[in-house]
Structure formats: C-alpha cells, structure tokens
C-alpha cells in the first residue's frame, strides 16, 4: 500500500459512526459478543473494566433512554445488542426493552467491577447460562477483541503483537510528518476523501437536534443567541451536539480516533465556520480531513484513553490545524496553530464523560479558533516555552509524554474523588 493509500485507510479506520458514548458502548459491544458465544439465555454476567472505562462510563447518558452508566448499557446489550453493529450495537433498542434491562439489574444478573492492575483500555465480560460460560476480553482499543472463550476453551486469541489492527494502523501515522499530512490533504482527489462529508452531515444533524430541543445544560442554546457571531456560532453548534450526545439522544455521531466527542470537535468548528464564511464544500472537506489526521496523530502518542481531555489536547489541536487550513494558512502557520494550542490548553483533565463535557468542548473550540487566528497573524508561542519544542511533531510527542508518563496517577485520584462523592 502506498503512503497515500495508507492515510486513506487510517481515516476510514479511525473515523467511524458511534451511537452513544464510546466507553459504555464498547462494554455493550463486548457484552453482545459474550452473549452470542454463550448461545443461551444469560443468567449472570460480570463486567470488569479499567479505571478509564469506569470513569468515562459512570455519568453518561445511554442513547434512547433517560438512564446513565455502564450497567444499563450492558443490560440493554443482553436484551438487544448485536456485535455486527459495532459502535452502534444498541441501535435496535425500543422503549419496551428498557424495563427488561432494569429488571436484569434489579435481579443482580449484571455486576460491574473495577479491574485493578491492568494497563490501558481493558474490558472483560464473563457470561454464564444454564449450561455454558463465555468470556470476552477487549484491550487497547474500543473494538479490539483479543480473547474469545467458551467453556474455558479458547475460540480466538490475538498475541500482543497482533492484538490490534486498529491501534497498529492508528500508530502508522507516526511515520508521517505534519507536512506529509498537509501535502496529502492538498493533493488527494476529493472523491477519495469525500466520505468525510458523511461525518460533517451526521454531526450537524445531532447538533441541530441538541439546539432545537434545548438538550442538556442549555449551553448551546445560550451561545446560539449570538449566532451572527461566527465564533459563538461554532461554539454553539459543537456544544449543542455534545449536550445531545451526553444526554443519550438516539442519533449517531462521526467519531475521530475512537471518540465521538473528539469527532464533534474535529468536525463541527470547521464545518460551522466554513458555512458562515461560505467556503466551498471541497475546502471544508479537506480542512476536516486535516483536522482528523492531526487528531489521530496526537492520539497515537497520548493513547486511546488518557487522564487529559482529548477533546482539548487532541481534537482541539486537530481543529486548530484544520481551521488554519480553511483560512488558507501556510504550513508554517499550521505548525504555529498546533503549537499555540498545545501551549494553551495542555493539562485539562478528563473526569469522565458527562453533560459538563459540553463546556469543555466549548473551551476547546474557542481555544482552537484563537490558536488558528494567532497563527494566521504570525503570532506564535515561542518554541522554548514549557513543553513546546522546535517542531510541531516534537511538541506533540512531549504532550504525549506529559499526558501518559507525567499523569500516571491522575486517573486513580480522579476516580477516587468521584467514588467518594457516591459514598
């Protein structure tokens, strides 16, 4: 595969539809697989997850319900989940299924545990029926099943080296530079990346629902009152989409690098500003493609789940690059936008997926616009400031090091605080 083809493949692999927050939905996906392998009615199911999955799934709405959390997602998947639907595993859900799922929880059919001592994304589902038992393990990536067992017999297992085509494909982007990504976006036939437009339309659709129905906090609705202001409009659209998604509104979003909220930030500021400034469709698509690629590039260093808010430090940085491109910025200005953003917003913590994420996305969009505007005026934060370096690539690597090695205890403390509130 040539380098151009590889970047197209990375985009197609990392930019996919997701119905609901990806962490509880990843659990629902694992549950559906365990149920299918079991081949009979589930009598008991154990769901074991790492700290990040637990944190991100704790307070987020589940699509098509007014319920929150991993347990209800798992119970619903026992009722209606189909693994063939991937991150849209619960799309067949009806109102009649909700009481059935609640009954499973009430009868202690489903149990949720925090799995200690695991590194990175980890989901283990153990299902038992009258005669059979099944086990599914997901690691490193929301859809990356590394182990399937039935009655103690291994059906399928992936070695660590082969355990994630998706992760390995994502990390292939490290072999490119930001210049390579811009050159690709400049020169690729628009037909080859036109699928990006599907995500623009999808995320605009949920944004409209969020704003029209005043879902969530009402932040999008507040900002919408100033929609003649281009910047406020971009913030309103992105916040409104996030409020709809975090509320559990039953519409899919186009994700980016494994996260639906990343997809909202990577796409909607560019699409909204492009719309207001009457940029042509092709320019918007190319700009969003660059935003996705930079987001994926950063996530290859920060990891699928991180103690820092990826909507800020990954998708927000991607959006700043895409916005700079939308406004005909040079390569040097795109470098500058990336570094400005890293200098400004690094360190925003991720304390789980919930309605408050809408405000974090609002801050991310605002910062990405500021970073791009600064760069377009050749205002660059100096390379010797903080964690920045001479190149955008090295600055991103430094960001990854701080976000992983430097904040290794952060998730543990955040979760401790969240659980203390429940006691």
UniProtKB/Swiss-Prot annotation:
InterPro entries: Ser_deHydtase-like_asu, UPF0597. It holds the Pfam family SDH_alpha. It comes from the Bacteria. GO terms for biological process: L-cysteine catabolic process to pyruvate. GO terms for molecular function: L-cysteine desulfhydrase activity. PANTHER family: UPF0597 PROTEIN YHAM. Belongs to the UPF0597 family. HAMAP family: UPF0597 (MF_01845). This is UPF0597 protein CTC_02309. It comes from Clostridium tetani (strain Massachusetts / E88).
């Amino acid at each position: 595969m040539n380098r151009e083809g590889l970047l197209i493949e990375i985009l197609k692999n990392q930019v996919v539809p997701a119905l609901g927050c990806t962490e509880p939905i990843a659990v629902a996906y694992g549950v559906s697989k365990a149920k299918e392998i079991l081949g009979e009615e589930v009598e008991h199911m154990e769901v074991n997850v790492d700290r990040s999955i637990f944190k991100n799934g704790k307070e987020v709405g589940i699509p098509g319900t007014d319920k929150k959390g991993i347990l209800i997602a798992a119970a619903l998947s026992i009722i209606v989940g189909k693994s063939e639907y991937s991150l849209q595993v619960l799309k067949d859900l009806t109102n009649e299924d909700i009481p059935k799922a609640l009954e499973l929880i009430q009868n202690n059919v489903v149990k949720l545990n925090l799995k200690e001592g695991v590194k990175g994304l980890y989901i283990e589902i153990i299902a038992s029926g009258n005669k059979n038992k099944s086990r599914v393990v997901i690691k490193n990536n929301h859809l990356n099943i590394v182990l399937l067992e039935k009655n103690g017999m291994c059906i399928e297992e992936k070695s660590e080296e082969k355990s994630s085509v998706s992760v390995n494909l994502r990390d292939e982007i490290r072999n490119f530079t930001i210049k390579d990504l811009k050159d690709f976006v400049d020169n690729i036939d628009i037909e080859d990346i036109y699928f990006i437009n599907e995500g623009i339309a999808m995320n605009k659709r949920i944004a409209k629902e969020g704003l029209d129905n005043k879902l969530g906090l009402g932040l999008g609705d507040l900002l919408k009152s100033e929609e003649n202001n281009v910047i406020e409009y971009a913030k309103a659209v992105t916040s409104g989409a996030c409020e709809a998604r975090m509320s559990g509104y039953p519409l899919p979003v186009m994700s980016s690098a494994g996260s639906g909220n990343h997809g909202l930030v990577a796409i909607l500021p560019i699409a909204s500003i492009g719309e207001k400034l009457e940029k042509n469709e092709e320019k918007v698509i190319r700009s969003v493609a660059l935003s996705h690629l930079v987001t994926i590039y950063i996530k290859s260093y920060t990891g699928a789940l991180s103690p820092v808010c990826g909507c800020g430090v990954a998708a927000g940085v991607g959006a700043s690059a895409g916005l700079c491109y939308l406004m005909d910025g040079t390569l040097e200005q795109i470098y500058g936008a990336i570094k400005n953003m890293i200098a400004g917003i690094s360190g925003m913590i991720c304390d789980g997926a919930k309605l408050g994420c809408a405000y974090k996305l609002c801050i991310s969009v605002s910062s990405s616009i500021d970073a791009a505007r600064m760069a377009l005026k050749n205002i660059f934060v100096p390379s010797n400031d903080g964690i920045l370096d001479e190149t955008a690539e090295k600055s991103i690597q430094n960001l990854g090091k701080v976000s992983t090695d430097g904040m290794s205890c952060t998730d543990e403390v955040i979760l401790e605080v969240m659980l203390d509130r429940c006691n």
